[in-house]
């Protein structure tokens, strides 16, 4: 499960409405939709300043931010392994912030995110928490598990105490 504000959410928003997705899905090339939309959004979205505050009160301010995502699993839409250390069983949220990079560097880093290799580069910040508030200097697209939540300048994410139990048939 993930939620994000900025570039990743803008991609989710656009993928939901583009006719390109249905066409590429019919060709079994649906993941290319994310690539095409990501390239377009990378060229048009303006980086912002964001403040990330965790439950401990620790506050970090980032400039020229493309996006911040909060995840409890490794992968986000299109197969991006944005938070390689994330686990659905560790009672922690993983945060990735992508900032202080040129558009060209973001473009070059995106393919490395499929394998989780992007974490080695400057401008990629990872953290963990149980609760976080993210504030942007202007309203940006927000998604929750790939579903658009419209434009927001503040989001608050926390873990619920109860866990979802799923019953599946035995083979």
Label each residue range with its predicted role.
Residues 1-171:
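Long C-terminal subdomains/extensions of small-metabolite kinases
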